[in-house]
Amino acid sequence: MTNFINLITIARILLAPIIFLCLIFNNYLVCIILFFLAGLTDYFDGYLARKYNAESQIGEILDPIADKILIVFLLIGLSVELDSFLIAFLSSFIIAREIGIAALRDYSSRKNISDRTKVTYLAKIKTSLQLFSIGSYLFALTISFNLLILISDIFLIIATLITIYTGYEYTLNVFKK
């Protein structure tokens, strides 16, 4: 069962470049359907792992990586597709934070203080808000509703502020005495 659950997570990773290509080639309906499917894989891999007590170390590592890959592919795709400096600018903070946190997790693991970089509730909200923002942009593109793009910008700004704050929080936590 563990292997099957990990395959669900890997499917989400494989969906990221496909969704990106659908976005770049203006196939918004397929894009939003695949994005929804990616969201379902995120839900079901966690649900099945808990239900069947099949949580694994590789699954713990793959799941957040799959989220980050999906988010990065789509933020880059959206910044290109919408020709948006704002999305590109905010994405640079999100991507830099994710790289920094990966380095912090590696460092804390080597120092045997990995408990200091456990995922926080606010970090889960951050990921959810990032994904919601992306979904909102995709929906706006699908129905050609420009006002929703502005609303999505606001959600992404809030997500980025939380992203920066949680990065700061993790950094303080790792280097506290």
Predicted regions and their residues:
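Topogenic membrane-insertion module of multi-pass membrane proteins
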Residues: 1-44, 127-147, 158-177
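Interhelical loop and helix-boundary elements at the membrane-water interface
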Residues: 1-9, 47-65, 107-129, 173-177
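Membrane-helix interface segments
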Residues: 3, 26-30, 54-58, 83-87, ...
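Residue-level signature of the transmembrane alpha-helical core
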Residues: 10-13, 33-36, 65, 92-95, ...
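Core segments of transmembrane alpha-helices
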Residues: 11-17, 64-75, 97, 101-102, ...
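Transmembrane helix-loop junctions in multipass membrane proteins, especially transporters and channels
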Residues: 24-28, 51, 82-83, 106, ...
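Hydrophobic core segments of alpha-helical transmembrane domains in multi-pass membrane proteins
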Residues: 31-38, 88-98, 153-159
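Multi-pass membrane catalytic core of lipid/isoprenoid biosynthesis enzymes
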Residues: 51-106
